[in-house]
Amino acid sequence: MLVQPWMSCQALAEVRKLVGTYKDEEVSITVTGHSLGAALATLSAFDIAENGYNCTASATFPVTAFAFASPRVGGASFKQRLDTAAAAGLRVLRVLNSGDIVPRYPALPYHDVGVELVIDTSASPYLKAPGDENVWHNLECYLHGVAGAPTASGEGFEHVVERDVALVNKSYDALKEEHGVPAAWWVPWNRGMVKGDDGRWSLLDCEDEDDREDALVSPVNK
């Protein structure tokens, strides 16, 4: 149930191959994604379980989808079929940020599916307040929220999983200034532009991946 039928067939064939290879071991299948990717993860996990790609002659292996910031993907009939697929080992965990509007759409007749885990990144002392729709939907902010938990008093936020807060600013300006992390720092060196011998700048075109990585390293780091 991917964007193109052949993509779905290719993915399912690979799952069947791996299940067959490791059928005598303890196996679990995990599918994950963010935003539209989370919707695809939900559909893919459902496809695997409903069509028995997680089964062998002697076992049914669990299939789990971790869907971050997923829009709704089906109506009442799909929800019913997905709930029924739980008997075939399917579990779906939808992680949503309280300020993110994407998981609320499309509206009815679309339905929420699976189990819902709500986080609230606005409670984080690391992030600028109040934030905006880009920050609330950003995957790194989601992972920051999942890595934390309310304090014992329930009035604050603390990290319970060691995760670098600098990652929050990979593509946005979400961290408070006091942390000294530049906004949107995750970019290729000079965005892939290189200066030629003639003094002109052009987009790097390397066929060899090692050459590409070497050219994109900052001269300061070489």
Q: Where in the sequence are the language-model features?
A:
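Serine hydrolase/lipase
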Residues: 1-32, 42, 46-222
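Catalytic nucleophile loop
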Residues: 37-38
